[in-house]
């Protein structure tokens, strides 16, 4: 006979202080091992257990939920619908009223947590706060010998949800089968009168619950340290946030740096692209140059071979060139000797006669009869019958006769061999003699349209010097200009009044020089022409009966030529004296008596010197006048002399023309000693330098 326990609704609730924490784990542990057919019950979140004391059985029974569902065992089948409070008659008394394994709680809405999230170490206690969303499952019935079912705390499992959001219900058709299966597997119930077995069962449950309670107490102790851990966690969070801000600022800096580096990388990339393009171009150029280098290398090999051949040929040609230079030098020396031999055969003193043509303003003047038999003979006859019968036929022979139609170039062509002798180291003297207005200055100087002997000599000298430079000769030209006016010497290159005298050279009795004279080293033809123009402007001239601008002094231009051959250590010294004599004039017709007397006296002394040389007298009166003293080396010394005799073609000049022609004929018949070449070799170089440095030296 089954005994029935008092109805749970009749039990009173305990009046003890209630804690705010629900020990759901205790219930969950007791209900966790229920069978598949075990039910669940709804747990009110406000229901709690007392402190550390376990409630008695009656209190446990009084704390049962108001809504219970009885699952039958054996042949009893449980109703699929939950029981309601109003149907108390339907509640069947179980075999063990204390068996709470058959209890199943209803779901409730979980309250929102009031605390922030907690660390993972207390996550296992989270079920206490979210128990409303879980369901209690009855553990499987134990199979003890006494067939006493041990009540265990319920185990929380996630509550299944139906499609409509409510708990899923079993279909009605399967309820009987499930009840029959559960009845077959259900444990044997304790008899209501077996208080000992029930006591042992409750004692065993008490031990289990006590163990779980102790465990929950430990867990609660751990939960008490959670606020401190939370504060520490919040501090760590603040530190982490500060570190995060710093990291973010660092990240921003790094991002800016990344942008800068990205820009740099882009720039470098573009530069790299251009560099690659340039590299490709340079590689193409390199390949081209390499190809050219290979071709040039081959060419270099051939050129080296060719160079070696040319070097050998050059050595041979150099030896031949030295031989040719020596032969050329010797040939040049032979040419000089032969040239001057021919000049000596022609005579050391030569006379050229020139008859000037009448000017346009002189067409009304009567001319004498001039007959040219050949190039060296001229016949002069007067148109006056009385003079013609008295003087008879006048025939004169000279080295060369120039008729009025002869040009300046024709005359200089006969003079140029003497200029060549001066370059070879000989002393040359060229002077013009004749009456006033006979054309002496025109022959020596000329006019800009038709230059005379002196300007042409300058051009020939510098042209010849350039040619001699190829033969190894270097020449230096020194020039002096002076005039003899009224037997006084004047320097035409200086406006100062100087005391100038003609003196004998110490090392050579045949040489003379003029003291205190200005000597200029000529660098080019223009420089020499400038000096000649200065001298011409300083020369004394005056208007006479025979010439509007007559030279009233004897002008002497001296050019000293010093040639040096460095290889042969040879020095050649030559000189050219170009003399423009003043015109002779009858004192009776002259208005300048003193000038005329001095001019005629110097010309008369020149005639006496020529006659003394012609008669080979022991004493030659060179010192009787400044002119003859200055021309002493040219007349009787080491010199080649050329005299121009200039005559006028007019009848009124017939007497003076005859006198001039006779004087020239007497000069042409003179025999002078052979001129010697001024040549210095080796040790004589120093001596020649000393001689050439004598101030204004004439005719070395």
Swiss-Prot record:
Main location: cytoplasm
Superkingdom per UniProt: Eukaryota
Annotated region (Disordered), positions in chain: 141-185, 681-700
Protein's cellular compartments: Cytoplasm, Cytoskeleton
InterPro entries recorded: Kinesin-like_fam (IPR027640), Kinesin_motor_CS (IPR019821), Kinesin_motor_dom (IPR001752), Kinesin_motor_dom_sf (IPR036961), P-loop_NTPase (IPR027417)
Binding site for ATP: 434-441
Region (Required for minus-end directionality): 664-668
Presence of the UniProt keyword Cell division in the record: yes
Enzyme Commission number(s): 3.6.4.-
One GO BP annotation of this record: distributive segregation
Cellular component aspect of the GO annotation: centrosome; cytosol; meiotic spindle; mitotic spindle microtubule; nucleus; spindle
Regions annotated as coiled coil: 196-346
Reactions performed catalytically: ATP + H2O = ADP + phosphate + H(+)
Pfam family, one: Kinesin
Family: Belongs to the TRAFAC class myosin-kinesin ATPase superfamily. Kinesin family. NCD subfamily.
Protein name in UniProt: Protein claret segregational
Organism phylogeny: Eukaryota, Metazoa, Ecdysozoa, Arthropoda, Hexapoda
